Amino acid sequence: NKGVGFIDAAIKKTIRGEKIEIWGDGNNVRDYIYIDDVCRMLISLFNYQGNYDTFNISSNTGTSQRDIIRMLEEMHLAPEVVYLPARSVDAKKIILNNERIMSIHEVPLVPIVQGIENYYQWLKKEI
């Protein structure tokens, strides 16, 4: 079970005492979003009556893999990281503009640190 994304895999591997593999230097940036925020945004879209037909479901905030590792360490977890050679297929930075969805969705987003903590607490109960 490799997980469904970097955060999921990093937390599960940390819990199991496995090494987290990071391709490159860990400075690749991604736009992570908490699942509850995705659900709330989708509900906002179901009720949307406007003219736009395309929306980015995103946090509009970039976070690197190194940042994620640091957050796990601040939660007093002990992730063990192995850095592997960078892959040419990995984009350095992916951050989506969420201005359009936020214009119809007025609920503040869950900060990434809180989302990671929430997921970790939920996962501990499930394992």
Task: Provide a role label for each language-model segment.
Residues 1-6:
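Flexible, glycine-rich beta-alpha linker
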Residues 14-127:
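C-terminal substrate-binding subdomain of Rossmann-fold SDR/epimerase-dehydratase oxidoreductases
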